[in-house]
Amino acid sequence: MEIVKIINNNIVSALDDENKEIVVMGKGLGFHTKAGQKIPEERIEKIFRLNDESEIGKFKELLEAMPLEHIQTSVEIIDYAKSVLKRRINQNIYITLTDHINFAITRVKDGMEFPNPLLWEVKSFYPSEYLIGEYAIALIRKDLGIEFKTDEAASIALHIVNAEYDSDMSNTCLLYTSPSPRDGATS
């Protein structure tokens, strides 16, 4: 596997055996290296294969502009989600969730947190994904020192739901059988 482009000290793009572009992560992979050099297998921590060439481009741009710790934490959350759910999830989650988490961290640092109006529904209809969201905010607190409100667990859960069903945020539908108690509905 040869380096095509150095994204940062720990992330490079490369070509796999089928000559398809991949993104490779590993400690120091891009440090003091250049395009054309072989990647030592033992230094590879994670390989990202996205099906669409345009998605690879978006992912590389995202990785160039983001702190490594945000990327690593996002990857850990996604790996945890895969292990808990034991089902295939769309690889685009590496783009969507990583971007979301990075932006959410920026918002918290700027004092701009927003409530998630779907919190109750996400907890009710997607309990496994919501628990993964809770795991995610605990991990972010531990690894990055950022304190999110519980609403963020629901936002993260929705990204996971989208990846499970090969959907995007605009197409995510929640089953809604009755008004939530927060709506002030009476029987």
Positions of PLM-derived features:
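Conserved small/polar residues in nucleotide/adenosyl-binding loops
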Residues: Y176-D183
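Short, recurring structural edge motifs at helix starts
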Residues: I78-I89, V122, I137-E147, S167
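Short, low-complexity cationic-aromatic patches
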Residues: L85-I95, S128-E129, D143-A154
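Phosphate-rich cofactor/ligand-interacting catalytic cores and adjacent structured alpha/beta frameworks
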Residues: K123, I137, E147-H159, S170-L175
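Extended intrinsically disordered, low-complexity coil regions enriched in Ser, Thr, Gly, Ala
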Residues: Q91, T106-P117, M169-T172
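Extracellular/lumenal glycan-associated surfaces
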Residues: Q91-I105, D151-Y165
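Intrinsic, low-complexity N-terminal interaction/targeting segments
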Residues: S124-E134
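A surface-exposed, charged beta-strand/loop segment in the N-terminal or early-internal portion
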Residues: I6-N92
